[in-house]
Curated annotation (Swiss-Prot):
Gene field: rpl2
Function per UniProt: One of the primary rRNA binding proteins. Required for association of the 30S and 50S subunits to form the 70S ribosome, for tRNA binding and peptide bond formation. It has been suggested to have peptidyltransferase activity; this is somewhat controversial. Makes several contacts with the 16S rRNA in the 70S ribosome.
Protein name: Large ribosomal subunit protein uL2
Gene3D superfamilies (alphabetical): 2.30.30.30, Nucleic acid-binding proteins, Ribosomal protein L2, domain 3
Assembly with partners or alone: Part of the 50S ribosomal subunit. Forms a bridge to the 30S subunit in the 70S ribosome.
Family the entry assigns: Belongs to the universal ribosomal protein uL2 family.
GO molecular function per UniProt: rRNA binding; structural constituent of ribosome
Matches recorded under PANTHER family: LARGE RIBOSOMAL SUBUNIT PROTEIN UL2, RIBOSOMAL PROTEIN L2
Organism: Picrophilus torridus (strain ATCC 700027 / DSM 9790 / JCM 10055 / NBRC 100828 / KAW 2/3)
Region annotated Disordered, chain positions: 194-233
Length: 233
């Protein structure tokens, strides 16, 4: 009798594949308008960026993705600011051309969707009916002027420069993000473990294309492709 493939075991939702959300800080979105003071800088599990613990005059606590150069007891402002400084959160319409911003909202009020990884930022290019930004990928994208963003670069730019050195350290890092530390090809498995497994040499042994309505356990390979991928051309 065959065994469940990895996709089926992941869908079952066991602890091996489930993200340890009890260790995470939750969704980090923009707080309400006001003046906040940085109370602490936290190294959050599951993230490659530090997180700021901020508090306002009403003693309301919020979390914010840290910017480069942040320090404890620093004041930051959130709202409609005419001349924003590094670390302030305001509308794209108020941020001058040539500025770098991060944690950019896709639509006004969603809390930030773009440029949230360590060391990244987008460049404000021009203003008009929409604000044009150059993203880290090199793509120019237009945003609504009422979308908010944080001025500056995200901290932790050297996160990827530090060598991991030990396999165990890498496994623990990936486990904090609920990712598998390795990938095994289907053709390298036994026939009992995968539809592509088995045989005297590594080969699929059947058409690798599968339809959209294929049942779980057989739905492996190229899913409903528009055309066949040709190698060596």
């Amino acid at each position: 009798m065959g065994k469940h493939i990895v996709a089926q075991r992941r869908g079952h939702g066991s602890l091996v594949y489930r993200s340890p959300s009890h260790r995470h800080l939750g969704d980090i979105k923009y707080p309400r308008d006001g003046t906040y003071k940085i109370e602490d800088i936290i190294q959050a599990p599951g993230r490659n960026t530090p997180v700021l613990l901020i508090r306002n005059e009403k003693n309301e606590k919020n979390y914010m993705i840290a910017f480069n150069g942040a320090y404890v007891n620093q004041e930051i402002h959130v709202g409609d600011i005419d001349s924003p400084a590094i670390g302030d959160v305001t509308y794209l319409a108020n941020i001058p051309d040539g500025s770098y911003v991060y944690n950019i909202e896709s639509i006004p009020g969603d809390g930030g969707k773009f440029c949230r990884a360590a060391g990244t930022a987008a460049l404000v290019i021009s203003h008009g009916a929409y604000v044009s930004l150059k993203l880290p990928s090199g793509v120019n994208k237009e945003f609504h002027p009422r979308c908010r963003a944080t001025v500056g670069f995200i901290a932790g730019s050297g996160a990827r420069d530090i060598p991991i050195l030990k396999a165990g350290t890498h496994i623990k890092y990936l486990q904090s993000k609920a990712k598998r530390p390795y990938t095994v090809r289907g053709v390298a498995m036994n026939a009992v473990n995968h539809p592509h497994g088995g045989g005297n040499h590594q080969h699929v042994g059947r058409p690798s294309t599968v339809g959209r309505g294929t049942p779980p356990g057989r739905k492996v390979g190229r899913l409903s492709p528009k055309r066949r991928k040709k190698y060596g051309r």
